[in-house]
Amino acid sequence: MEKAIEVKGLRKSFNDAEVLKGVDFEVKRGEIFALLGSNGAGKTTIVRILTTLLKQDGGTAFVNGFDVSSKPEHVRQSISLTGQFAAVDEILTGRENLIMIAKLRYLNNPRQVADSLLKSFGLTDAADRRASTYSGGMRRRLDIALSLVGNPPIIFLDEPTTGLDPEARIEVWKIVKELTNNGTTIFLTTQYLEEAEQLADQIAILNVGRIIAGGTLEELKKLFPPAKAEYVEKQPTLEEIFLAIVGKKGRK
């Protein structure tokens, strides 16, 4: 399958602090790729480099076939980014937010684009309310809808459920799963182990600036034998895998 993202030897330092220490991974088209790591592991730094908001110090990164260093404008045309905090204009209504982005992308029929996305995200009834009146889950749904204006092939979701209650988080998970049905590639960063377990086709664990393990959930589970309790095999959870891998690397 064709690669949507390819990263080799990515390095980045801030002053004397080396944040990325030679990161390698690839993301196939149409899959959900979860970059899992604790706070300060370097997840957001990777997202900022891949979305052309930050220059790497070394290594290469290609997004949708374009080098982020030499073809940043082509990369930006191929992607959308939703950060940890909603980038919604709270003074505008939900519909007005979407129309504004559609106009900025020079799309035909901005209102039609807005109405279609409002329907897809279950926001039609709230379309003419100011975004400031939306719940956290509704605001996040609108934020993700904004990222879909223009149908970018690759979407970066940087900790998209930070600050949401469990019910709103499940709402967002459902939306993310549905996005890949249309062939969209999702690059997801999260510190929620359950989020990666629920959503990801591929998981990479980032720790202190390095990818220390990667693969499908089943492949990661094979790194650790199942525990036996009362003659029943208990498969390791992603949380147990994460803590075991990070703990091993931390002791080295």
Map each language-model feature to its residues.
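Catalytic Walker B motif of ABC-type/P-loop ATPase nucleotide-binding domains
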Residues: I155-E159
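Conserved ABC ATPase "signature" region
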Residues: S80, I99, K103-A126
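ABC ATPase "signature
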Residues: G214-G215
